[in-house]
């Protein structure tokens, strides 16, 4: 490796070494300390070479070597960290500066916090100085640079998250993000990093969260204003999603003035936008505000027209439930409505409560997208947890285009329950259905819903055109029978035997809506061309996780609840007759309960 005046060969050799070391690091393998030490002289030579590409490569190898050489190499790695930081501001080559910013992502996790924590402020200052000296405005030619800056800032902050309270770290991160808000990868990095930061700060108590809000709220609300003025929708979406993260992990109660700072912006967005990417996080932000500090929300008035808070949020919900907003954009309105009903109750909502519930039922009748349907159903499910009888009484007297509200809601509810996603949501739904069943209300039993799929075995593959001409046929069953069918299915899912959860199934159904000639054939082959991480691939081999591949894990709590229900239900009059109407497969599942 020591050929004078042949730097390109050295740089090529270092490139190969860098690749090999990264492969070692990816599989969590270390190189022997003696071998790592043997590279130090070469690295030192490269770091002082006149050729900037060789210097840059030397820093890159130094970083990955620090990660793979183990604790015995930390003293040398610490010297690399100091040299890297100096090069960011002191090296004349931009190539070297960018390489050093990237190398920090390798060096920081390779060293103990006793070394890296004192370096946080200097690193943030160096990255800030670099960012200020360069034009980071939107452009594909610098997208990679902005991603590198954001990742390095994220890793620096994560050494000790409190640094955001005493430094411009988040200002620099937001500046990088605002100049690349249309870059999905960059936005994802910044959003996920901010979520982690807010969670860590909020866990330290109210005082720390208040200081965080004082630091970031002016930037976030200002970004919404700038995005509106410049019509940069991507910037507005980013700011709204960061506000959502801030509210979601907020303290209880929220800091004084939080609602007054945030709600006017969110109200304007939710009443004026049709962009689904903007409406969803803004809706969730309002929902989290209600959840964390309903009293502060109630005390707020809309400044332009002087509307009280309840009226303001009811107008928002009414607009999102209306025909001008599609299913995708309105996907979170059900959660907002449910939160409002729970927090305000009939005492505060008064005559608005039945109007609100009727509007939810009306939109549920026409909803098509699974997440939106789930969101609306959960409004009634959460009310059922409190008073199932009142929910049935209300829906029975509601008229929806000539149909009983009970018929409309129960049909949609029971047909889509198997598609529910999210452990909390699934548990709420299961308990609500059990409460409905235990009412033993004749009005529920009179509602006819879709039962089992009628299998038509023609021996031929069914094309899409044939499926449209001859849609699937289902049996009709009473609602209380369908509840049992759903709960039997949920019992199997809670035991961890389900292969794919509802969200994945719904996604497959939506993919099948293209105008191709043939049905998609389900496959167990893993497509290695997909952009998934090694950890996700390993998780797939081990059975997956709900968040990764939509596979539901075993849920002992839910399973125990269902077991108790079936044990009690089986002793009641009429259950044996109901049992006889189940499919053989469903009967076997219940028999296996013992």
Regions found by a protein language model. Give the residues of each.
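Karyopherin-beta/Importin-beta family HEAT-repeat alpha-solenoid scaffold
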Residues: 1-594
């Amino acid at each position: 490796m020591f050929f004078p005046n042949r730097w390109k060969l050295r740089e090529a050799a270092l490139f190969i070494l860098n690749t090999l070391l990264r492969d070692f690091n990816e599989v969590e393998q270390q190189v022997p300390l003696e071998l790592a030490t043997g590279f130090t002289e070469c690295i030192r030579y490269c770091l002082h070479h006149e050729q900037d590409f060789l210097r840059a490569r030397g820093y890159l190898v130094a970083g990955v070597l620090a990660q793979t050489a183990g604790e015995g190499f930390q003293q040398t790695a610490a010297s690399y960290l100091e040299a890297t930081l100096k090069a960011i501001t002191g090296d004349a080559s931009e190539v070297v500066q960018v390489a050093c910013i990237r190398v920090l992502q390798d060096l920081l996790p390779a060293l103990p916090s006793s070394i890296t924590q004192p370096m946080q402020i200097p690193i943030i200052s160096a990255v800030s100085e670099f960012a200020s000296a360069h034009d980071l405005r939107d452009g594909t030619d610098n997208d990679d640079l902005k991603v590198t800056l954001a990742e390095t800032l994220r890793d620096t902050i994560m050494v000790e998250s409190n640094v955001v309270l005493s430094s411009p770290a988040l200002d620099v991160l937001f500046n990088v993000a605002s100049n690349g808000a249309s870059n999905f990868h960059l936005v994802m990095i910044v959003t996920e990093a901010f979520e982690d930061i807010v969670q860590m700060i909020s866990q330290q108590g109210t005082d720390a969260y208040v200081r965080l809000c004082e630091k970031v709220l002016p930037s976030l609300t200002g970004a919404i204003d700038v995005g509106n003025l410049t019509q940069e929708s991507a910037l507005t979406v980013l700011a709204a999603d960061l506000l959502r993260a801030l509210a979601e992990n907020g303290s209880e109660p929220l800091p004084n003035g939080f609602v007054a700072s945030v709600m006017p912006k969110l109200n304007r967005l939710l009443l004026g936008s049709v962009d689904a990417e903007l409406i969803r996080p803004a809706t969730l932000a309002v929902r989290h505000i209600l959840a964390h500090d309903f009293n502060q929300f109630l005390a707020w008035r809309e400044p332009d027209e002087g509307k009280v808070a309840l009226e303001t949020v009811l107008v928002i919900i009414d607009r999102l439930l209306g025909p001008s907003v599609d299913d995708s954009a309105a996907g979170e309105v059900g959660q907002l409505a449910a939160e409002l009903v729970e927090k305000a109750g009939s005492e505060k909502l008064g005559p608005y409560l039945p109007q609100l519930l009727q509007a939810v039922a009306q939109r549920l009748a026409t909803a098509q997208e699974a997440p939106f349907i789930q969101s609306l159903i959960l409004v009634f499910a959460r009310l059922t947890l409190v008073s199932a009888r009142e929910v049935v009484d209300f829906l029975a007297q509601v008229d929806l285009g000539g149909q009983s509200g009970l018929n409309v809601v129960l049909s949609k509810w029971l047909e889509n329950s198997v598609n529910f996603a999210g452990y909390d949501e699934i548990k709420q739904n299961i308990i609500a259905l059990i409460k409905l069943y235990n009412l033993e209300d004749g009005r529920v039993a009179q509602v006819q819903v879709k039962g089992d799929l009628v299998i038509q075995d023609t021996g031929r593959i069914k094309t899409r055109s044939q499926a449209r001409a001859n849609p699937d046929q289902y049996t009709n069953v009473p609602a209380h029978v369908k509840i049992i069918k759903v709960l039997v299915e949920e019992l199997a899912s809670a035991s961890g035997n389900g292969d794919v959860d509802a969200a994945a199934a719904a996604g497959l159904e939506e993919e099948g809506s293209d105008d191709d000639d043939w049905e998609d054939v389900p496959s167990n082959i893993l497509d290695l061309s997909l952009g998934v991480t090694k950890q996700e691939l390993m998780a797939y081999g081990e059975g997956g996780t709900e968040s990764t591949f939509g596979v539901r894990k075993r849920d002992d709590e839910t399973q125990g609840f269902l077991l108790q229900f079936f044990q009690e239900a089986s002793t009641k009059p009429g259950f044996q007759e109901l049992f006889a109407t189940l499919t053989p497969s469903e009967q076997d599942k219940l028999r296996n309960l013992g």
